[in-house]
């Protein structure tokens, strides 16, 4: 299964930080661990062919460089493209959502057929793009840390359980 992963870093990190600072830092400093869990242990969204495996061909991390510059090297070493999304307003609002949506829609037009779009964000603003992806017969997998709307969750083919992600993915490969 050809997959593309889009990480709304600010959203995931702040959601994890509300749970536990150490957990948030583990997510930010060890993306290779949870990437391996995604590749080796996370189920595929239905319907998947028997024996199919996930290949994450696109790895993009969208982050506010003013707040989270210190985590760039970890994501770079894990093979991510890093898209800087600095604050655009005096309240600190970034353009992460629109960058992610435009990139997802752009991938629909590419020669490579991506079977799965993985969205790491609890932001319900992604609900319309999840529905568009469904209309284009693409599978969607969502990780939402903290509260997410019922409509957003219902628009995903596969929801990664927040507790499973924290318990299994963030410690994947540790002995």
What are these regions (language model features)?
Residues 8, 61, 104, 119, ...:
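A residue-level signal for conserved active-site and pocket-lining positions in enzyme catalytic cores
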Residues 95-98, 110-150, 157:
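Active-site histidine-anchored catalytic micro-motif
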Residues 151-175:
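C-terminal helix of von Willebrand factor
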Residues 70, 103, 128-129, 151:
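Phosphate- and divalent-cation-binding pockets in alpha/beta enzyme and binding domains
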Residues 1-99, 109, 134, 139, ...:
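Domain-level signal for Mg2+-assisted phosphodiester chemistry and nucleotide/NA-binding surfaces
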Residues 109-118, 167-175:
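Short, basic, helix/turn surface patches
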Residues 48-53, 105-110, 129-131, 164-169:
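A general structural signal for short secondary-structure boundary/capping elements
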Residues 55-57, 113, 155:
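Short loop/turn motifs at secondary-structure junctions
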